[in-house]
């Protein structure tokens, strides 16, 4: 379609009286946001109704105007819910589409609705209302995931697995303890969500374009109607602030990073080289060429989508970094990254909350893996320290023993007491080691010995789960 073709008569736009020629069709499509900001329809109606109620209370519009506006908005809401509302590209955005339809339905009362406000404070209000509802939904789903982790952790509070550093076997832990680490991560995410909601739950409406309005408005009344905790204190900041959208995307980036770390482990654990878990078929897919394949697409996609959410954050930061006060058209570009982050986080949390309870744990495989790689070597060093040896000397002694076992292709528990003393270079100090050492060299003994708050002992894991359920 030719970029020089003009498709609009000036009168079609709310701002057209200033202009002498119609908008170029390509410009119209380039500048319109109705393709994506339809999502604001219900919160836009809610904001308009609250604004109209305040205008009537302040005698800025009549009671009849308010009644007409309420009646018209009810019909518009029904049309939207039924999929019968006709969105028009020529009207640019959700705000002017609804206002035009309202005026068509109720006449002059519809024209009075915009008294004392601008699309600048209107869209800022819509953004906060929409994001607040989204945050509340995400909070519920995040809680479901946290409960799922608690339930699985409780079931496997005594299931032994290898703990890793550098992806090398480090020390025995329990699977329940491992899951509780993710519970802690997601709990911090939940706390961040509460904090950011409290920060942005303030009303921009009343700031108008940027300087406020000459009408005797009552912003506090509108804030109460819409459930805000208060009003934005500066009209310039009210219309230009997008910190809340950036902060949500920052929260989302951290949360998705946690999801991605869990996803990476699920992918590893599901691989034949680990074989620690299995996932139900409904959370996996196959291959179009390899008949045997069962691919963990859900956690793999979650890893991939994490980068996408990072991109949403960078988009918003870049969008805002060079804007002078107050509102600029750049801010039309704030919505799609925010929508994408909300959708991605919500979908990811929902599927993980559904998937986590159905993780099939192969406890015997996990325990066997924990018994490899000299996972209890640190326990032997601690044992020697408790017998009176300095830690660095104990560390060196056990390192010699491990090296000897590697050369003999055996484990520490395969050695006799005399052989273990000799391997540690302690055969001349028999008082430092007796038969009780072997109980500590088992993975069960190692795990049970971590009897302190935050430790991996099953009793401590269960205590942590109990505290977590109380906090929830």
From Swiss-Prot:
The GO biological-process annotations, alphabetized, read as: arginine biosynthetic process via ornithine; L-arginine biosynthetic process
Q: Which domain of life is it from?
A: Bacteria
Q: State its location(s).
A: Cytoplasm
* Primary location recorded for the protein, binned into one broad class: cytoplasm
**Pathway annotation from the record:** Amino-acid biosynthesis; L-arginine biosynthesis; L-arginine from L-ornithine and carbamoyl phosphate: step 3/3
Q: What is its EC number?
A: 4.3.2.1
Q: Name one GO molecular function term.
A: argininosuccinate lyase activity
Query: What is catalysed by this protein?
Result: 2-(N(omega)-L-arginino)succinate = fumarate + L-arginine
Q: Which InterPro entries match?
A: Arg_succ_lyase_C, Argininosuccinate_lyase, Fumarase/histidase_N, Fumarate_lyase_CS, Fumarate_lyase_fam, Fumarate_lyase_N, L-Aspartase-like
What PROSITE patterns does its record include? FUMARATE_LYASES
GO CC, any one term = cytosol
Alphabetically sorted, this entry's keywords are:
Amino-acid biosynthesis, Arginine biosynthesis, Cytoplasm, Lyase
Q: Which HAMAP family match?
A: Arg_succ_lyase
Report the sequence similarity comment from the record: Belongs to the lyase 1 family. Argininosuccinate lyase subfamily.
PANTHER family, sorted: ARGININOSUCCINATE LYASE
Q: What is this protein called?
A: Argininosuccinate lyase
Gene that codes for this? argH
């Amino acid at each position: 379609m030719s970029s020089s073709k003009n498709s609009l008569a000036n009168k079609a736009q709310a701002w057209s009286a200033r202009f002498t020629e119609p908008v170029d069709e390509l410009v119209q499509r380039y500048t319109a946001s109705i393709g994506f900001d339809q999502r604001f329809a219900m919160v836009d109606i809610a904001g308009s109704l609250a604004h109209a109620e305040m205008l009537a209370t302040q005698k800025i519009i009549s009671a009849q105007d308010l009644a007409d506006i309420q009646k018209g908005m009810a019909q518009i809401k029904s049309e939207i819910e039924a999929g019968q509302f006709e969105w028009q590209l020529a009207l640019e955005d959700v705000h002017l589409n609804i206002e035009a339809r309202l005026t068509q339905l109720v006449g002059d009362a519809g024209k009075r609705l915009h008294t004392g406000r601008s699309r600048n404070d209107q869209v800022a209000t819509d953004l906060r209302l929409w994001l607040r509802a989204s945050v509340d939904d995400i909070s519920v789903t995040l809680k479901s995931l946290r409960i799922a982790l608690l339930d699985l952790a409780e079931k496997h509070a005594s299931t032994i697995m290898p703990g890793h550093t550098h992806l090398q076997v480090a020390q025995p832990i329990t699977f329940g303890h491992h899951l509780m680490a993710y519970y802690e991560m997601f709990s911090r995410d939940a706390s961040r969500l509460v904090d950011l909601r409290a920060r942005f739950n303030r009303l921009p409406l009343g700031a108008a374009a940027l300087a406020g309005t000459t009408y005797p408005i009552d912003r506090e009344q509108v804030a109460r109607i819409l459930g805000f905790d208060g009003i934005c204190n500066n009209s310039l900041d009210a219309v230009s602030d997008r910190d809340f959208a950036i902060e949500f995307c920052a929260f989302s980036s951290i949360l998705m990073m946690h999801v991605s770390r869990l996803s990476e482990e699920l992918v590893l654990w599901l691989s034949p080289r680990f074989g620690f878990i299995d996932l139900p078929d409904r959370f996996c897919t196959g291959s179009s060429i390899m008949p045997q394949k069962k691919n963990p697409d859900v956690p793999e996609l979650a890893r991939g989508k994490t980068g996408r959410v990072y991109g949403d954050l960078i988009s918003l930061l870049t969008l805002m970094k060079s804007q002078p006060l107050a509102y600029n058209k750049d801010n039309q570009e704030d919505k799609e990254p925010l929508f994408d982050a909300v959708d991605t986080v919500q979908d990811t949390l929902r599927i993980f909350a559904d998937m986590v309870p159905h993780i099939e744990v192969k406890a015997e495989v996990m325990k066997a893996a924990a018994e490899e790689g000299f996972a209890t070597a640190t326990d032997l060093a601690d044992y020697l320290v408790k017998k009176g040896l300095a830690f660095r000397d104990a560390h060196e002694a056990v390192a010699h023993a491990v090296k000897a076992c590697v050369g003999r292709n055996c484990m520490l528990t395969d050695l006799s007491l005399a052989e273990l003393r000799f391997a540690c270079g302690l055969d001349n100090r028999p008082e430092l080691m007796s038969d009780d050492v072997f109980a500590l060299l088992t993975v069960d003994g190692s795990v049970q010995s971590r009897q302190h708050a935050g430790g991996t002992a099953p009793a401590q894991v269960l205590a942590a789960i109990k505290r977590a359920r109380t906090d929830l």
